[in-house]
Amino acid sequence: IYISGAFGKFILGGDDGVNDIIPPAPNDLISEEMYYTSKDGTADADHFLGIKNGDMANLAGNDNKITYMLPAMGGLSAGVSHTNKSAAGDADTTELGASYTMDAGGASIMIGGVTGTTENSTQDIDSQQIGVQISTGNATVVLAQSEYEADGDDEQGTSAGISFKVSDAMTLGAFTSEVEDDLSSEEYTNTGAEIQYTIASGLKAIINVEDYDYKAGTSGGFSDNGTASKLTIKATF
């Protein structure tokens, strides 16, 4: 649900907050990214890692929240999100973000950043991200850096992605990411590629291949590496 006007835009509900709306991220260029890990105890299973790329952690998930976006001011965009997790307020999440878009040398450049905090009884959970997006012709490149801090976590992530529209029917994408936890010595790297192909109007095939490596460090998890692939068929009506 949203309400918009000269005052800006209010968004209510379980949608993502400004962490997903504002800053550019390499994930935005890939339609069906997996960031795969296969064994128990790795980054997906027990969440030993709060981030797996250069994108900010989605601290509030799909919980109900209110987001306010300021009215457009030239190339500037800014907003705030708040998630009221409990009546006591001991697990609320607040996010602030801003971005600026400009033209330079025939390219469109966007620079954006976001920061968020979830209140916690032991140590607040904090995550930040800054990203740069450059678009020219049929190509778009995004570079991003993120951080995640919580009780027992001090993580830094970087990622880069590129998307190229070959034709009206085909788009190619690729990305690479790396995350390190200074406290547990965990490391996660992932490099992937994607092909999007429009078979017919409303019907699209998407092929993804990713190569990943997870080092558990002292986290108590299981180190893991491998290659994952996926075929997705999307139909829209």
Role assignments for model-derived ranges:
Residues I1-F237:
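Outer-membrane beta-barrel proteins
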